[in-house]
């Protein structure tokens, strides 16, 4: 889970942990990028607006890295305009959720669709 908001990071971490997933958190895109290059993950969930590296750049770097191209990526962002959603999907995100219409069940269903149940 990559998000500069402690509240959002903890919410997503607890939601996934309570379902049996092992969760690692990163405070921004740069920390997320360093983590995915050095550890093995089944899924990345990232915000867009973050310091040092935004989520779009993180998704793009993941999609450009030969050893990470198949890593599923979800964006969960406050940006709710259609052009923001399209930008995230064009960068290579598998799912794009807005925090304003965020539902735990939707996120968990998307995680299950991408990597299966914990």
Where would I find each of the regions flagged by the language model?
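Short hydrophobic/Thr-rich beta-strand motif most characteristic of the beta2 strand and flanking loop
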Residues: 20-27, 35
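Active-site beta3 strand of CheY-like receiver
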Residues: 39-45
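C-terminal output helix
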Residues: 100-111
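Receiver (REC) domain active-site loop signature in two-component systems and cognate sites
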Residues: 50
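Charged docking surfaces used in two-component/phosphorelay signaling
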Residues: 10-18
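Active-site residues of response regulator receiver
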Residues: 47, 77
């Amino acid at each position: 889970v990559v998000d500069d908001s402690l509240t959002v990071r903890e919410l997503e971490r607890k939601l996934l942990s309570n379902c049996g997933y092992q969760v690692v958190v990163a405070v921004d895109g740069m920390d997320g990028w360093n983590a995915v290059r050095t550890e093995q993950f089944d899924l990345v969930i990232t915000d867009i607006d973050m310091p040092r590296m935004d989520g779009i750049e993180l998704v793009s770097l993941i999609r450009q890295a030969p050893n990470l191209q198949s890593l599923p990526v979800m964006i969960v962002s406050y940006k709710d305009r259609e052009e923001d959603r399209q930008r995230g999907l064009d960068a290579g995100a598998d799912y794009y959720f807005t925090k304003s219409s965020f539902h735990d069940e939707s996120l968990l269903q998307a995680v299950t669709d991408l990597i299966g149940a914990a």
